[in-house]
């Protein structure tokens, strides 16, 4: 073999990744782009390895996990956006995220034990505490002499 690196086989000197030295470098494509995802597949793979969840991590595991996380994030954001629009707001705040999660049956079950900071609570009034509708009001059909709720609630006591 001479100093140029060409030996008996007649092959030229190899550079990184098996390409010929001096040739055009191929543009790298991330695994997120290959999978059609927005979430970072490489970073999730690094976290899986670093976290020591298992001895070895398969090549498909970070892709699958990134896809699942992206789907969940999109679902929560869509519902939170709807909650913001219902409240005539253009910016999603933690309150909207909480309303979105707690009003959705499956997300509420998944994130049941999660506390969202500055989310507040769901509006809920026990039906027992609501004012009772009287039979007189229902039969009158909306007469002009409608009693106020305080007067309707107070009825003469019978001994």
UniProtKB/Swiss-Prot annotation:
Cellular compartments annotated: Nucleus; Chromosome
Top-level taxon in the UniProt lineage: Eukaryota
Segments carrying motif SPKK motif 2: 155-158
Matches recorded under SUPFAM superfamilies: Histone-fold
Positions of region (Disordered): 1-31, 133-159
Purpose: Core component of nucleosome. Nucleosomes wrap and compact DNA into chromatin, limiting DNA accessibility to the cellular machineries which require DNA as a template. Histones thereby play a central role in transcription regulation, DNA repair, DNA replication and chromosomal stability. DNA accessibility is regulated via a complex set of post-translational modifications of histones, also called histone code, and nucleosome remodeling.
Assembly notes: The nucleosome is a histone octamer containing two molecules each of H2A, H2B, H3 and H4 assembled in one H3-H4 heterotetramer and two H2A-H2B heterodimers. The octamer wraps approximately 147 bp of DNA.
Protein name: Histone H2A
